[in-house]
UniProtKB/Swiss-Prot annotation:
Ranges annotated as spanning the membrane: 16-36, 41-61, 84-104, 162-182, 200-220, 245-265
Pfam families attached to this UniProt entry: COX3 (PF00510)
Protein name per the record: Cytochrome c oxidase subunit 3
Biological source species: Oryza sativa subsp. indica (Rice)
Membrane topology, record value: Multi-pass membrane protein
Length: 265
């Protein structure tokens, strides 16, 4: 069939992963709601749904890597699809984070009488922005420089240098996640402490979750680079990871200025 096709597009074979992913997502959602409302079996259904969903993600991406790396189905025309999809996904994530920052700004610019008409609310402790938050802020942009180094190394065909750069990126990402964990451990307030706690932990936690996802993405890229999967002309997966990581490291500046610094004084 491949030999007879006269176009540059990849006609994928029938796959069970879309339906299995849908079932895993359904079980995760229903199980999560049941667990939050203390229904019997909610935790079990949630755990099974997550396991099924993670397994589906693993085997589905495994098949995509086989089709692109080993079978050569990802032509230039096919590569445009993942590129456009990655860009649109990042745009949707920007809108997500914009909503959280909007909520924080709205609450701080017009504090209600229920919280004393001041921001931060009366009686709520806040983190000192000039300690761990300030120390943590330049780490992600530094990791962004390291991932750019890796990209240039791939384009130059220097495989070992690309691996070293990706290792440096991942290490900086882990340090950043560790610092954020220290922030939360030392935080004088919780997510249930008024609108300040809700917006603070939701915005910073959502960004921290993106850092973890991006770190996993880069770890996979590092393994693939070590195995020789990425070449000068075929490294769309790495490009998507690099774009995502630049989004993550730039966004870090916004919570520091609007939440830690301006919103916490």
């Amino acid at each position: 069939m491949i030999e007879s096709q006269r176009h540059s597009y990849h006609l994928v074979d029938p796959s069970p992963w879309p339906i299995s992913g849908s079932l895993g997502a359904l079980a995760t959602t229903v199980g999560g709601v049941m667990y939050m409302h203390s229904f019997q079996g909610g935790a079990t259904l949630l755990s099974l749904g997550l396991i099924f969903l993670l397994y589906t993600m693993f085997v589905w991406w495994r098949d995509v890597l086989r089709e692109s790396t080993l079978e050569g189905h990802h032509t230039k025309a096919v590569q445009l699809g993942p590129r456009y999809g990655s860009i649109l996904f990042i745009v949707s994530e920007v809108m997500f984070l914009f909503a959280f920052f909007w909520a924080s700004s709205h609450s701080s610019l017009a504090p209600t009488v229920e919280i004393g008409g001041i921001w931060p609310p009366k009686g709520i402790g806040v983190l000192d922005p000039w300690e761990i938050p300030l120390l943590n802020t330049p780490i992600l942009p530094s990791s962004g420089a390291a991932v750019t180094w890796a990209h240039h190394a791939i384009l130059a065909g220097k495989e070992k240098r690309a691996v070293y750069a990706l290792v440096a990126t991942v290490l900086l990402a882990l340090v950043s996640t560790g610092f954020q964990g220290m922030e939360y451990y030392q935080a004088p307030s919780t997510i249930s402490d008024s609108i300040y706690g809700s917006t603070f932990f939701l915005a910073t936690g959502f960004h921290g979750f993106h850092v973890i996802i991006g770190t996993l993405f880069l770890i996979v890229c590092g393994i693939r680079q070590y195995l020789g999967h990425l070449t000068k002309k075929h490294h769309v997966g790495f490009e998507a990871a690099a774009w995502y990581w630049h989004f993550v490291d730039v966004v870090r500046l916004f919570p520091f200025v609007s939440i830690y610094w301006w919103g916490g004084i």
